[in-house]
From Swiss-Prot:
Residues 1-21 form the signal peptide. GO terms for molecular function: ion channel inhibitor activity; toxin activity. This is U8-barytoxin-Tl1a. Expressed by the venom gland. It comes from Trittame loki (Brush-footed trapdoor spider). It is found in: Secreted. Residues 22-50 form a propeptide. Belongs to the neurotoxin 10 (Hwtx-1) family. 26 (ICK-1) subfamily. Disulfide bonds join C57-C71, C64-C76, C70-C86. InterPro entries: Huwentoxin-1. GO terms for cellular component: extracellular region. The presence of a 'disulfide through disulfide knot' structurally defines this protein as a knottin.
Amino acid sequence: MKTLVLVAVLGLASLYLLSYASEVQQLSVAEEEFGALIDAFGGLLETEERGVNKEGCRKFLGGCENTGQCCLHLFCKYDTPFNHFCAWDLSFGRK
């Protein structure tokens, strides 16, 4: 009787270990898939900030042709067709 109980307990323990190992393997596969998904969409999350560490960006009230030329927190504004300048875009901190 004692050996039968011991064999049953050992059998249950081995089944537990096998199912646990299978679950861990499935989790690692899911983590790999999630990592690949994040890498695929990572480019969408990273945005290039305008004017950060960019040589020659136009300062406040400097002449410009488009917003990409202005430094951070500035945009290219025009009041006449020939008068374009960098103006504050009313933002603070990091974008």
